[in-house]
């Protein structure tokens, strides 16, 4: 009776699950990834009425990867798993999203609150009555945990979790017990959108930091801009572009920052990754007397084995929660507001010429013929074939490093997992990215993945077919785990894999007529395929077996692998 009275007092009653899903729709999510399980089934019934499409992945790990890829294109995503077995299958993907600042709302269907209070010995538990253990595991890779156990707190917990996910650009964890799915809460709150705006900087503090930045910038003789992943994740790309335009400064990207700036812009200078950079880029960045570093993540793979040669004394770091000018750090101040004011007050700065970049093939590399396809030839060639606004996904390994040599057309979105580096990630991410692209108007989605990595997650090709997605998948066939070979065990059998008939796999997954597979082994084969207009714009999934020599790898991969091997000794 108490529940009935409480419900009658609500002005606009709404079920908890509906409230949650309508909030997801409000922030731009249109598809939800995950795997059904008995503790989330009742909640899934609410998706259609809330305008959300259920993707239905092959396993939870892949679903997490897909949610990551969807978020990188769409801005935010949602993942639904079931208690224990499902959420722990996904936690690797969630950890990757946490490390790389990708916003995923992870919703976990839980047993009835009564069962939890009584410590019942239910399936999917550890058998010890502890129903909080999995939430504790997820807390370390989530920016907030919202447990929807009390109707009086549910709406606030949901709204706060989604806001934190958006603002901090990291996963959040929400538990939804089976009995809470249909509980009534006040729905009038849905009339007020969640406030997704950044907290304003303290004006006095912000102005002071801006003045300090400008003092050093105006004094510098050879300043440059270096853009990295957190500029993308924390949504300052417009500010980066405006600074690039207003200042005329040479602008470079770190590997994780690929796609952050227009690579056709006259000020774009290339990829800086320490010793992994080309000579002209390395010289200009390392001889600079002031580096405006925006959103840096200075990890091993992002710096070609920690080979950056730029000192903090010549660096101004802009981040989402602080700005560091040389050795002085200013906490609790976000870079977005600071960058805007720097642009407004910029004035004249000393801008050096930018090195000319192109996708020209190396002079000493045979341009065509019946020769094997090499990395030195392939990655610049890809730059000639890509189109504006493509989505380019590269797997950890040869593709991740090879793409550094590709100059993108305007508007390209680059997706990779350079920091977390979970092999197989890119296949699931491709599914999520392709779905987000379809929702936005069918931008091309192109995946480059190794024959070793694809064997971990290839089931998501089935999900691509099921959801009528049309990515172009290049499988680099080079007989195993190349990056591992360069780190340790060149001839070791543990770096070998079983050879598969990759181009036949989509047929096994039910692709039917809406699929085409290719096998290319020479440069002439590749050139002919790139000239094929149907291949460039087919409305269905395509897979290319791309054969490369076993011992071949991008030079930056070799350098980084050597550094990793030395640290492991």
From Swiss-Prot:
Its EC number is 4.1.1.1. This is Pyruvate decarboxylase. Mg(2+) binds at residues 451, 478, 480. One of its GO terms (biological process) is glycolytic fermentation to ethanol. Pyruvate binds at residues 38, 124, 484. GO terms for cellular component: cytosol; nucleus. Belongs to the TPP enzyme family. Its cofactor is Mg(2+); thiamine diphosphate. CDD domains: TPP_PDC_IPDC (cd02005), TPP_PYR_PDC_IPDC_like (cd07038). The lineage of its organism: Eukaryota, Fungi, Dikarya, Ascomycota, Pezizomycotina. InterPro entries: DHS-like_NAD/FAD-binding_dom, PDC/IPDC-like, THDP-binding, Thiamin_PyroP_enz_cen_dom, Thiamin_PyroP_enz_TPP-bd_dom, TPP_enzyme_TPP-bd, TPP_PDC_IPDC, TPP_PYR_PDC_IPDC-like. It is an enzyme of class 4 (lyase). It comes from Aspergillus fumigatus (strain ATCC MYA-4609 / CBS 101355 / FGSC A1100 / Af293) (Neosartorya fumigata). It catalyses: a 2-oxocarboxylate + H(+) = an aldehyde + CO2; pyruvate + H(+) = acetaldehyde + CO2. Homotetramer.
